[in-house]
């Protein structure tokens, strides 16, 4: 592993933070640091039982290492351990959250909005669908619709919220089919449609412009789940159509979810939910016998939304979560200070590098006669999937699993995914493909900026790993 800069970054910053509280009586230092060191060494050994998620040779799941500054800022904040539920628990970190969320909203083109961080994308999506249900009011049986390729959490969330849920079939590109969506909308019982910008399986981008056009005709909420793909809004020139057009109109959605702990270089868990209509804060209205006492005493922060009473807001007043780590807000704020969300900045260049790596890997795979690529074309974002040529879906799945294991033996870590066989080019054998037949495929998420520079080495290891299983 490379030398970790975090201890050095923390040393001076910790001194400065402690100086902020120097007027307080001193406390005795923690005792028995030898025993703590021993336990921490045991922790280090236990953590060695992990895949090397931080390394570019890990190209499997959606795992991107936090920026060193994010780790340092998070650790520094833990000296205070703020709780961003209320300002009583985190004054500075609440303000930093408001500022960081403002930057995220601005990336999507919103200057007026309601939003906050969450402990996960799941919680962020839950809040968005909860508001959709609340907005539907007393109309019983109003459904949530999402593509069959949307994250499974939407189905589970809808069940928790007791909202009927229906899946809309996807096309061979993994995008929601508009003809099937309109057939559901004609039934007149749809509260909201979930539009995914970057599906988990293949990074597909649902056709948001067409969904918005249907909203004008049928009247429903549009929730954009951009938990994975949201940050790629910064690199439109690196995207192809129709994905570019989908990102261009995201500001017209009713709500958006994005996960800074995916592409945003943040530690888990850091999600974010945004609402275009600030009046939807009314659905959150509640009081607490324990907190919110300081609202009227605090001066307003220049960038924060106002509470329902007109004073400075406690973030818990516009959130379903109660206790929530203020350190996550501190880490995100610090990262965005260093790497602003600018299309011409260093952060955006890193996103473009991952996208370029995915396109190059896809190009090489399409030139390999042993591979069946997606019929519909190249990756929309930075996720590559491919099927292995074989006489049957079962044999193809077995080969994929064998290569997956062989790659791991070569210190290259990929992922597996089950996809409809019909999404892939027909094999040379002329086999008949059944629409509902699933086949296990290889999958690579190339979300690290370093993946572009490491692609030759990734390819060399992949080819070496392929030699034994495919040659059998």
Identify the function of each model-found stretch.
Residues 7, 11, 120-286, 294-298:
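Conserved PLP-enzyme active-site core in the AAT-like
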Residues 68, 157-160, 322-326, 428-438:
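Short glycine/proline-enriched loop/turn "hinge" motifs that connect secondary-structure elements
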Residues 80-88, 110-116, 139-142, 165-170, ...:
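Glycine- and acidic
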Residues 89-93, 115-122, 145-148, 196, ...:
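Active-site nucleophile and cofactor-binding loops and adjacent substrate-binding regions
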Residues 97, 101-104, 124-133, 154, ...:
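Buried hydrophobic packing segments
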Residues 238-370, 374-377:
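Active-site C-terminal subdomain of aminotransferase-like
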Residues 373-413, 417:
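Conserved PLP-binding catalytic core of the aspartate aminotransferase-like
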């Amino acid at each position: 592993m490379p030398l970790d800069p975090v201890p050095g970054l923390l040393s001076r910053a910790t001194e400065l933070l402690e100086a902020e509280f120097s007027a307080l009586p001193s406390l005795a230092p923690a005792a028995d640091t030898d025993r703590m060191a021993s336990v921490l060494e045991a922790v280090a050994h236990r953590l060695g039982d992990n895949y090397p998620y931080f390394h570019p040779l890990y190209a499997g799941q959606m795992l991107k290492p936090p920026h060193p500054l994010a780790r340092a800022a998070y650790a520094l904040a833990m000296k205070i351990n703020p709780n961003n539920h209320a300002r009583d628990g985190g004054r500075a970190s609440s303000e930093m959250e408001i500022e960081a969320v403002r930057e995220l909203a601005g990336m999507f083109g919103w200057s007026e909005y309601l939003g906050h961080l969450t402990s996960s994308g799941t919680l962020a999506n839950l809040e968005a669908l909860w508001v959709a249900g609340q907005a539907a009011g007393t109309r019983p049986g109003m459904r949530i619709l999402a593509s069959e390729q949307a994250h499974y959490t939407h189905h589970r969330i809808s069940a928790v919220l007791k909202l009927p849920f229906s899946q809309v079939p996807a096309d061979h590109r993994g995008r929601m089919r508009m003809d099937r969506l309109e057939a559901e909308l004609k039934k007149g019982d749809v509260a909201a449609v979930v539009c995914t910008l970057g599906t988990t399986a293949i990074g597909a981008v649902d056709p948001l412009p067409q969904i918005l056009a249907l909203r004008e005709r049928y009247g429903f909420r549009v929730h954009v789940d951009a938990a994975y793909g949201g940050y790629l809004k910064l690199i439109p020139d690196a995207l192809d159509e129709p994905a570019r057009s989908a990102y261009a109109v995201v500001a017209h959605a009713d709500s958006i979810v994005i996960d800074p702990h995916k592409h945003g270089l943040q530690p888990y868990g850091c999600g974010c939910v945004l609402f275009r209509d600030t009046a939807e804060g009314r659905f959150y209205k509640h009081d607490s016998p324990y907190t919110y006492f300081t609202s009227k005493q605090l001066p307003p922060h220049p960038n924060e939304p106002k509470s329902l009473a007109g004073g400075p807001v406690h973030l818990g007043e516009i959130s379903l979560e109660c206790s929530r780590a203020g350190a996550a807000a501190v880490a995100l704020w610090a990262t965005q200070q260093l790497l602003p969300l600018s299309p011409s900045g260093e952060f955006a260049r890193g996103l473009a590098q991952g996208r370029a790596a995915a396109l190059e890997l896809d190009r090489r795979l399409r030139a390999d006669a042993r591979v069946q690529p997606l019929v519909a074309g190249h990756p929309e974002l930075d996720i590559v999937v491919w099927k292995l040529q074989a006489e049957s879906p079962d044999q193809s799945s077995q080969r994929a699993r064998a290569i997956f294991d062989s790659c791991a033996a070569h210190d290259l870590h990929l992922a597996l995914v089950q996809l409809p066989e019909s999404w892939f080019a027909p094999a040379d054998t002329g086999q008949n493909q059944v629409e509902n037949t699933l086949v296990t495929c290889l999958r690579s998420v190339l979300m690290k900026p370093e993946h572009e520079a490491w692609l030759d080495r990734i390819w060399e290891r992949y080819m070496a790993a392929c030699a034994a299983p495919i040659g059998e």
